[in-house]
């Protein structure tokens, strides 16, 4: 990434460990190309939902969490910081994920998979900025502290414009 790009979009996960690993690989690419360290902007991509109730916020985006898990772990789990105890569940997600239902809102098979496989909390923590305004602010701060230059969110839920409004007013505004 860093050897050829000016900006790299990262969707490998939002934990500090995963972000630092991704950024390290980008910086290695910069060094190979003779670029100044930090010349490549790092953007992170996150599924987002905000609510006064964390469980409600997560419930509304389970299908998107399953989609992120399906995408990120499609070819291998090697080097992807997946806990050993979740590897079999991730393998089942890969086999049973239904592309025809990709990110459809509501009670879909893909939404149910994350709960059935006990992956919901892991996928939410890894791929989303989701929960109460306080929880979302904390997550945004940790993403920034890991070295990310820009956070791109996709508002997922029954009312995306309300998610964007609340995110701007209750998460981004207070973090400045």
Model-derived segments and spans:
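An alpha-helical appendage that flanks or caps ligand/catalytic pockets
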Residues: 24-145
């Amino acid at each position: 990434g860093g050897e050829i790009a000016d900006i790299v979009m990262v969707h490998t996960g939002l934990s500090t460990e995963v972000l630092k690993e991704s950024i390290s690989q980008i910086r290695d690419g910069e060094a190979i190309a003779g670029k100044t360290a930090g010349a490549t902007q790092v953007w992170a991509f996150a599924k987002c939902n905000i609510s006064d109730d964390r469980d409600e916020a997560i419930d509304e985006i389970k299908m998107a969490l399953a989609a992120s898990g399906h995408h990120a772990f499609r070819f291998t789990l090697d080097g992807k910081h997946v806990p050993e105890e979740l590897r079999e569940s991730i393998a089942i997600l890969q086999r049973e994920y239904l592309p025809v239902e990709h990110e459809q809102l509501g009670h879909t098979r893909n939404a149910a998979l994350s709960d059935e496989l006990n992956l919901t909390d892991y996928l939410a923590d890894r791929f989303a900025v989701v929960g109460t305004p306080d929880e979302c602010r904390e997550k945004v701060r940790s993403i920034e502290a890991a070295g990310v230059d820009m956070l791109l969110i996709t508002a997922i839920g029954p009312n995306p414009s309300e998610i964007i409004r609340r995110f701007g007013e209750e998460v981004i505004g207070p973090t400045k």
